Amino acid sequence: MRCLPVFVILLLLIASAPGVDAQPKTKYDVPLASRHDFAKKTPKRLSKPRDCCLRHFLCCV
């Protein structure tokens, strides 16, 4: 019976600990950008020459 209060306290401490993301971030996780940021980046993207290939058609997007 002496272990029960210790167990309850430990359980409460574990429950109040900060959580960790279950899924690690990947290179495809990007923060949401505002419209202003998008407007500034679009001309830069359009002016860059791109090497598109048949295997990776998404590089042209």
Curated annotation (Swiss-Prot):
Instruction: Show the GO MF annotations.
Output: toxin activity
Query: Where is this protein chiefly located?
Result: secreted
Per the UniProt record, the source organism is: Conus ventricosus (Mediterranean cone)
Q: Where in the cell is it found?
A: Secreted
Q: Name the family the entry cites.
A: Belongs to the conotoxin T superfamily.
Q: Show the domain comment.
A: The cysteine framework is V (CC-CC).
According to the UniProt entry, where is the signal peptide? 1-22
Entry's Pfam families?
Chi-conotoxin
Protein known as: Conotoxin VnMRCL-011
PTM info: Contains 2 disulfide bonds that can be either 'C1-C3, C2-C4' or 'C1-C4, C2-C3', since these disulfide connectivities have been observed for conotoxins with cysteine framework V (for examples, see AC P0DQQ7 and AC P81755).
Do the record's keywords include Cell membrane? no
- Keyword Disulfide bond recorded: yes
**Origin: domain of life:** Eukaryota
Gene Ontology CC terms: extracellular region
Keywords associated with the record: Disulfide bond, Neurotoxin, Secreted, Signal, Toxin
Q: Please tell me in which tissues this protein is expressed.
A: Expressed by the venom duct.
Q: What is the lineage of its organism?
A: Eukaryota, Metazoa, Spiralia, Lophotrochozoa, Mollusca
Propeptide at 23-50
**UniProt-listed InterPro entries:** T-conotoxin
